[in-house]
Amino acid sequence: MRHVYVGNFDYDTRHSDLERLFSKFGRVKRVDMKSGYAFVYFEDERDAEDAIRRTDNTTFGYGRRKLSVEWAKDFQGERGKPRDGKAVSNQRPTKTLFVINFDPIRTRERDMERHFEPYGKVLNVRMRRNFAFVQFATQEDATKALDSTHNSKLLDKVVSVEYALREAGEREDRYAGSRRRRSPSPVYRRRPSPDYTRRRSPEYDRYKGPAPYERRKSPDYGRRSSDYGRARARSPGYDRSRSPIQRARG
């Protein structure tokens, strides 16, 4: 059985995505995913060679990133699962563990907590789409859990456990939290009220208020009334023009 190294895929790439891709070239025994890279184990060495030749430097995933596929070197294999079956990591030990390869649909935070709490006090479990962070109270508990749970089964899935990069995990959470808390306030609370009062009230006063209506109507109505009054003023003249004739005939 030979295994190949796969790198440069999207961070949210799933275990099933890689298994589906490389199963096209032969029987895949297992896929061991790490943080940013993976090892794909083929039953036949010729299938592994064919997969390297046809997938290296090809685009993959939603981000259309170019894969890096090559034969796995001995030191790369030791970072995953050595012959004695224990986990080996060249990362600095932290209190937080990085967990992948679990079932993202069936696995809940409580399932993850039950899986790790026999090895120490679990302070926090943060689950994402297809990976999780498990934070322990002490460094000793985290190391004990890493040695005991790497390549263990969680809901019928063999999970991979490593030390988390503390800086990357904390920055992600702080950025996501601040973005959720602060983005609604300037858009919803600050903008609508001043725009509404400044834009609508002057137009309403200029076009719908009672003052312009009275200024437009009253002069016209007054002029028409004065003309009517002048028309009625001719009646005395009419009476005066007819009265001499009527007097003469009389």
UniProtKB/Swiss-Prot annotation:
List, for all copies, the residue spans of the domain called RRM: 2-74, 95-166
Look up the coiled coil feature and give its residue ranges: none
Question: Where in this protein does the record put region Disordered?
Answer: 170-250
**Localisation:** Nucleus speckle; Nucleus, Nucleoplasm
Q: Which GO terms describe its biological process?
A: mRNA processing; RNA splicing
Q: Where is the composition biased (Basic residues)?
A: 177-191
**Record keywords:** mRNA processing, mRNA splicing, Nucleus, Phosphoprotein, Repeat, RNA-binding, Spliceosome
> Which N-terminal residues, if any, form the signal peptide?
none
Entries under Pfam families matching the protein: RRM_1
Is Endoplasmic reticulum among the key words of this record? no
Question: Bias regions of kind Basic and acidic residues — which residues?
Answer: 192-230
Gene Ontology molecular function, alphabetical? RNA binding
Name the family: Belongs to the splicing factor SR family. RS subfamily.
Describe the protein's quaternary organization and the partners it interacts with. Answer: Component of the spliceosome. Interacts with MOS14.
Q: What does this protein do?
A: Probably involved in intron recognition and spliceosome assembly.
What is the protein name stated in its UniProt record?
Serine/arginine-rich splicing factor RS31A
Can you name the source organism?
Arabidopsis thaliana
